[in-house]
Amino acid sequence: MASPSGKGARALEAPGCGPRPLARDLVDSVDDAEGLYVAVERCPLCNTTRRRLTCAKCVQSGDFVYFDGRDRERFIDKKERLSRLKSKQEEFQKEVLKAMEGKWITDQLRWKIMSCKMRIEQLKQTICKGNEEMEKNSEGLLKTKEKNQKLYSRAQRHQEKKEKIQRHNRKLGDLVEKKTIDLRSHYERLANLRRSHILELTSVIFPIEEVKTGVRDPADVSSESDSAMTSSTVSKLAEARRTTYLSGRWVCDDHNGDTSISITGPWISLPNNGDYSAYYSWVEEKKTTQGPDMEQSNPAYTISAALCYATQLVNILSHILDVNLPKKLCNSEFCGENLSKQKFTRAVKKLNANILYLCFSQHVNLDQLQPLHTLRNLMYLVSPSSEHLGRSGPFEVRADLEESMEFVDPGVAGESDESGDERVSDEETDLGTDWENLPSPRFCDIPSQSVEVSQSQSTQASPPIASSSAGGMISSAAASVTSWFKAYTGHR
């Protein structure tokens, strides 16, 4: 037997025994032991590096005890006792588990009962809340039913009202259709009445006719009288007299110098091409020559009278047709003898603008209109062949014709328009100053002021003398050629 302490062998002091025989037995056992005897080898029992005093067989078999006498029980006996204790422990554990199994089941049942009670309470609360919500929903349902009933009755009333309104609308539609037919018939009767009044006015008081002059071209007359002018200059002047500025371009006018348009009689007429150079020449001569003008067939008087009558006719037509003119022009505008070239040109532009405006309102064929032909446009307006004469309603204004109307006399724009005496206020030029200018295409606007029609017609016509009319036409043609020649040489 060996001790696990690993120290030197000590004699066991037991009663009746000496240390010698024990030491001898140990030496014998050591000599008989097998294995390595190394000082550093660890003990397999205590895991120390003390000196080994047991044999390997005893250690393997467990046949060893403590040498110090603490416990005489062998290791193998301890091991057997440990195994027995473990088996008893397992038996005790099984018995304990078996004894506690009933309590565990009881606890499980108690937990289940508790959870069921909690769930029952929750279900009761949920049922109470559900009942409350059902009561609220039932009350809301009753209110909704009452509301739906009211809405249904209201819808029935609205349906009845709708049917009543539809019947009323059908009656109104029939009435409107009938009134529309009546209005159209009234418009037709009004147009016929206006047409008859206008035709009576233009046939009795203001007859407008086309008069053949039967005179030679003033350029040819001037070329025969003035040998200094070259043939090229004469041809250029003749070509210039046969062209007219229309819609932004120069067009050829075959009837430029062959015809004239008369108003109130053949002795009061205007040039067909809108050339008022005879009046300009008379104004210049009036400035240089003092004293009364004794010539009764002066073309300036004829032009002034024709323009004055045209102004009166335009104002009367605007009253009959119920059309507000865009430009304010008095009946006596052309009656004065002191009209300068600028004032005269401005007044002619106003008259042409008003005539074009009336032509637009009566849907005159735009291909026939030329902005500078005053009486010819007026003749087309009051012509018996005009289909829409006397009409009422909206109309469209042609912007290109209005722009072409601005080009009356190119020499006027560069002259003394800036002087204080020649300036014209807005009230004298435009009636629609308070209205907004709209971009093209422009439709008719109702001006803010009305044109006074009932003004005194104080202009007297010249005596109907055929010879004086012919002489006036010749003088006008000669003066026209002279003005063209002056303008031509001045520009050169």
UniProtKB/Swiss-Prot annotation:
GO biological process, one term: negative regulation of protein phosphorylation
Entries under InterPro entries matching the protein: UV_resistance/autophagy_Atg14
Biased composition regions of type Low complexity, renumbered to the chain: 448-473
Modified residues (Phosphoserine): 29, 416
Disulfide cysteine pairs (residue numbers): none
Keyword Ubl conjugation tagged: yes
Membrane topology: Peripheral membrane protein
Gene Ontology CC: autophagosome; autophagosome membrane; axoneme; cytosol; endoplasmic reticulum membrane; extrinsic component of omegasome membrane; extrinsic component of phagophore assembly site membrane; mitochondria-associated endoplasmic reticulum membrane contact site
Annotated stretches, region: Cysteine repeats: 43-58
Post-translational events: Ubiquitinated via 'Lys-6', 'Lys-11' and 'Lys-63'-linked polyubiquitin chains on multiple lysines by MARCHF7, leading to ATG14 aggregation and loss of interaction with STX17.
Domain note: The coiled-coil domain is required for BECN1- and PIK3C3-binding and for autophagy.
PANTHER family xref list: BECLIN 1-ASSOCIATED AUTOPHAGY-RELATED KEY REGULATOR
Family to which this protein belongs: Belongs to the ATG14 family.
Name recorded for this polypeptide: Beclin 1-associated autophagy-related key regulator
Biological source species: Homo sapiens
Species lineage: Eukaryota, Metazoa, Chordata, Craniata, Vertebrata
Gene: ATG14
